[in-house]
């Protein structure tokens, strides 16, 4: 699959280093002594049964959850320890209001990230949803909503993507589009961590089972 992706401002690629991270919920240990180094252009797929802490670990890397122990460092020098300008986050919610169209929603997110509107349609075309640009989100399928959310992530133009079950509601075609989007991001020096229950075909991606870190 060959897609035409838009020209966005150059990324400022950054490394990500996680050292000795431990996380718990109440008295239950979810993750123990987890470490990783992720360089620009790399991707990592985290797997594991429900309850192994995939979402909690992603949220800790994003700075939403304080770990029990360990450290998360982005880049080097003065930007170290700060995720605010480096991370694009995709959680379980797609961030679409039912009465809004993708055009309205994505224009809002583009403005929030100081991006122009021009990349919206090419990114929607790359995800094969350009014909839905003026359809209210309430009339989109879950898979179509997820594709819109992935466009939102790309519009942020951040070097590090943290994706929680990005392919959850996607069909085979959607997963292929997701793989192409991730490949484009990595080709620009971006990196990706994704938590997933599904087998995703991302070339050269690191794979880790969180069940080994409990």
Swiss-Prot record:
All copies of domain ABC transporter, residue ranges: 16-212
Localisation per UniProt entry: Cell inner membrane
EC id: 7.6.2.5
Keywords, ordered alphabetically: ATP-binding, Cell inner membrane, Cell membrane, Cytochrome c-type biogenesis, Membrane, Nucleotide-binding, Translocase, Transport
Membrane topology, record value: Peripheral membrane protein
Predominant subcellular localization, coarse grouping: membrane
Molecular function terms, GO-annotated: ABC-type heme transporter activity; ATP binding; ATP hydrolysis activity
Protein family membership: Belongs to the ABC transporter superfamily. CcmA exporter (TC 3.A.1.107) family.
Protein name per UniProt: Cytochrome c biogenesis ATP-binding export protein CcmA
Highest classification ranks of the organism: Bacteria, Pseudomonadati, Pseudomonadota, Alphaproteobacteria, Maricaulales
């Amino acid at each position: 699959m060959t897609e035409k992706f838009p020209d966005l401002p150059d990324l400022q690629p950054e490394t990500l280093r996680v050292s000795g991270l431990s996380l718990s919920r109440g008295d239950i240990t979810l993750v123990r002594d987890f470490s990783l180094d992720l360089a620009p252009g790399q991707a990592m797929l985290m797997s594991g049964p429900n309850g192994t802490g995939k979402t909690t670990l992603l949220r800790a890397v994003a700075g939403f959850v304080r770990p029990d122990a360990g450290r998360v460092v982005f880049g080097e020098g003065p930007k170290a320890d700060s995720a605010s300008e480096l991370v694009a986050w995709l959680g379980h919610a797609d961030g679409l209001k039912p009465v809004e169209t993708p055009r309205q929603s994505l224009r809002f997110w583009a403005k929030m990230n100081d991006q122009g509107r021009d990349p919206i349609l090419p990114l929607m075309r790359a995800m094969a949803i350009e014909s839905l640009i003026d359809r209210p989100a309430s009339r989109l399928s879950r898979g179509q909503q997820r594709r819109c959310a992935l466009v939102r992530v790309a519009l942020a133009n951040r070097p590090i993507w943290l994706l929680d079950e990005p392919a959850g509601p996607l069909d085979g075609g959607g997963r292929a589009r997701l793989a192409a989007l991730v490949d484009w991001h990595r080709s620009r020096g971006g990196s990706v961590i994704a938590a997933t229950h599904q087998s995703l075909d991302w070339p050269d991606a690191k794979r880790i089972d969180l069940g080994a870190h409990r």
